[in-house]
C-alpha cells in the first residue's frame, strides 16, 4: 500500500564506500569527489525540476567545492519547492578504515575530518541545516555507531 508521500521526494544519495584513506589529502579529495558526484547526479536526474539545470551542473563542476555544492543544491531546491530525501550509504566506511589502520596517521586523519571544522562534520552540518527547509527525510546506513558519537 503506497503512502501519501509516494513520489513526493527527490532522492539525493551519497555512497561513502571506497573512499581513499591512505592520507589526509587523498581522503579529502576522495570524500569531496563522492559529494560532487552525488550532487551532480542528483541535479541531472531531476533536471526537469531545476531551472537551468545544465548550467547549474556546469557551475557545480567548475566552481563549487564539495560542501558548497550541497548548499547550492539545497538553495536551488528551495527556490523550486523540491522536497529532498537524503540517503547516506556506508556513512562509517572510511571511519572504520581509518580506525583499523591502528596508526597515529589514521587517528589524526579521523580526528581532523570528524571533529570541529572537519570536512565530514561540515557535511553533516549542512544536511542538518537543510532539514529546516527542503531536506525532509534522511536515511543513514552503516555497520557501527562509532562515528555517530564523534559528530
Listing of model-derived features with the role each one plays in the protein:
Residues 1-151:
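Phosphate-binding site recognition
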Amino acid at each position: 500500500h503506497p503512502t501519501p508521500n509516494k513520489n513526493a521526494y527527490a532522492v539525493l544519495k551519497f555512497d561513502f564506500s571506497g573512499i581513499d584513506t591512505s592520507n589526509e589529502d587523498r581522503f579529502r579529495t576522495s570524500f569531496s569527489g563522492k559529494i560532487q558526484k552525488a550532487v551532480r547526479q542528483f541535479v541531472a536526474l531531476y533536471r526537469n525540476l531545476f531551472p537551468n539545470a545544465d548550467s547549474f551542473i556546469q557551475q557545480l563542476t567548475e566552481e563549487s567545492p564539495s560542501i558548497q555544492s550541497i548548499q547550492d543544491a539545497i538553495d536551488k531546491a528551495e527556490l523550486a519547492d523540491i522536497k529532498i530525501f537524503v540517503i547516506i550509504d556506508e556513512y562509517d566506511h572510511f571511519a572504520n578504515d581509518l580506525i583499523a589502520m591502528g596508526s597515529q596517521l589514521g587517528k589524526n586523519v579521523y580526528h581532523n575530518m570528524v571533529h570541529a571544522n572537519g570536512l565530514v562534520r561540515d557535511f553533516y552540518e549542512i544536511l542538518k541545516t537543510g532539514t529546516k527547509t527542503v531536506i525532509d527525510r534522511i536515511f543513514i546506513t552503516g555497520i557501527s555507531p562509532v562515528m555517530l558519537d564523534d559528530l
